Amino acid sequence: MMVLEQSETSRLGPVFDSCRADNRAALIGYLPTGYPDVPTSVDAMIELVESGCDIIEVGVPYSDPGMDGPTIARATEVALRGGVRVRDTLAAVEAISQAGGRAVVMTYWNPVLRYGVCAFARDLESAGGHGLVTPDLIPDEARQWIAASEKHRLDRIFLVAPSSTPHRLVTTVGASRGFVYAVSVMGVTGARDAVSQVVPELVARVKAVSDIAVGVGLGVRSREQAAQIGGYADGVIVGSALVSALGDGLPRLRALAEELAAGVRQRTFM
């Protein structure tokens, strides 16, 4: 089978290369801009950088978050009530970059359309962003974004799920750059006690067609889960658990991030 090789222009490629050299997965932490307020959310993202997160996913709160679990949905509501704007997310990306971190934005597609696809790509590049995670955008409908991301050297992170057909998987992986975001179901996110067994098979399916890095979002909330997923994935993505920890304050967030960072460094091979 032909293997799709990742473009050398990937902004996040060197991050994954560095982690592989350390024989570990990358830790990718998600927080929404504006929770519990904009300044605290930015401080929290910088805490993640300082606590060992290799990539920060900066969320754009959206009023119709169809794929968010209850923890992130509640945080998004708080952020929207506080008046958060897309420009606050771009400012957060800039702050992360200035702190020595690497940021990607995670957003539903509608806010980008409203902002303007080309303008958003331009401003994300200017802020020091590395790419965009688009959970509700499929490559077939992403022509404008693909063109803008090429112009502004931004990585494109699309989602794959166990339900992805072979054709859909190849199409999605081929359109992605930086990493592919693997989920257990194409649906709601959230922390879980047990990690799914179908996702290692999904990662293997991606690896059969491409050398792109694969990040896994599976509701991770413990060092042990981070170690387990880090045994087969290139990146361990944590969202809901970090949002919950932030609800208890920055010290709790830092403690969890440090625990997860230790987890990816003691990967457990299946």
UniProtKB/Swiss-Prot annotation:
- UniProt keyword terms in alphabetical order: Amino-acid biosynthesis, Aromatic amino acid biosynthesis, Lyase, Tryptophan biosynthesis
What is catalysed by this protein? (1S,2R)-1-C-(indol-3-yl)glycerol 3-phosphate + L-serine = D-glyceraldehyde 3-phosphate + L-tryptophan + H2O
- Name the active site residues: 57, 68
For the protein in the UniProt heading, the enzyme class is lyase
E.C. code:
4.2.1.20
Check the record and name the CDD domains matching this protein: Tryptophan_synthase_alpha
Give the matching Gene3D superfamilies.
Aldolase class I
Q: Which PROSITE patterns match?
A: TRP_SYNTHASE_ALPHA
Metabolic or biological pathway? Amino-acid biosynthesis; L-tryptophan biosynthesis; L-tryptophan from chorismate: step 5/5
Question: Which InterPro entries does the record cross-reference, listed alphabetically?
Answer: Aldolase_TIM, RibuloseP-bd_barrel, Trp_synthase_alpha_AS, Trp_synthase_suA
Q: Name one GO molecular function term.
A: tryptophan synthase activity
Q: Which GO terms describe its cellular component?
A: cytosol
Assembly information from the UniProt record: Tetramer of two alpha and two beta chains.
Q: Which HAMAP family match?
A: Trp_synth_alpha
- Of which family is this protein a member? Belongs to the TrpA family.
What is its biological role?
The alpha subunit is responsible for the aldol cleavage of indoleglycerol phosphate to indole and glyceraldehyde 3-phosphate.
Mind telling me what this protein is named? Tryptophan synthase alpha chain
Whose protein is this, by species? Mycobacterium leprae (strain TN)
The organism's lineage is: Bacteria, Bacillati, Actinomycetota, Actinomycetes, Mycobacteriales
